[in-house]
Amino acid sequence: LDISMNSVLKDYLPNNLKLDNIRSLNISGIGLDNITFLQNAKKLESLVAEENAIKDLKPLGNLKTLRTLYLDKNDIRDIGPLKDLDNLEELLLYKNNIEDITPLDGKRYLYRLMLNDNIALKDINVLRTVQHLSSLDISNTAVSDISPLNDLKYIYYVAVKNTKISDSDLSKFEKTNMDVKKENGIDKKLEIITTEASKYFSLKNYIFMLLILIFTVTGIRGYWKKNK
């Protein structure tokens, strides 16, 4: 169900709204500051609630089936209600006012996490327990210690633009993590984004590799046709 960008609905969503069988809901850009009406959406698996004025996440506390949760560009400070949402796989929390991410402790299925632009965020120690984390953005935060990510064998993308993490610590992290990957037989290069330029060139490289692959396959097929 997609009712995003319909600001006229802001004042017409009753707390007892029937959402019992809804599995996917997009309520982005409505201007919501109250999401009490979601508390009974017990089958909800995907919630996109970007660009609102949400502060209180308590109504989400019992939505145990949630797997995808987009809450970026709100006014969230406390993510405590997410503590028991053990099935989360994707969590977008960028551009909020979050300082404490300990409620993410032990999220075993969480693989994508965006915390960028939470400028007061300093401590990411809890992420050492998020064992399947593979993509993380902590750009534009006050994070200075990246060592909690050292032993995350599945991590392959980390964005750290405009943080307090030193170049030497990034180098140590890269070496340590690659050793961990090697020990676990994982052949996936770690990509660390430190500037907008590095992100651009990284994307450029991927596109280049894709084009080479396409041209190579096309060329081989052409050769086969000519030599049948």
Label the predicted regions:
Residues 195-210:
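Juxtamembrane/start-of-transmembrane alpha-helix segments at the extracytoplasmic/lumenal side
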Residues 216-228:
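C-terminal membrane-anchoring or membrane-association module
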Residues 210-216:
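Core hydrophobic alpha-helical membrane-spanning segments
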Residues 14-16:
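Short amphipathic alpha-helix with an adjacent loop that forms part of the alpha/beta core around
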Residues 1-9, 21-33, 43-55, 59, ...:
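Concave beta-strand-loop units of leucine-rich repeat
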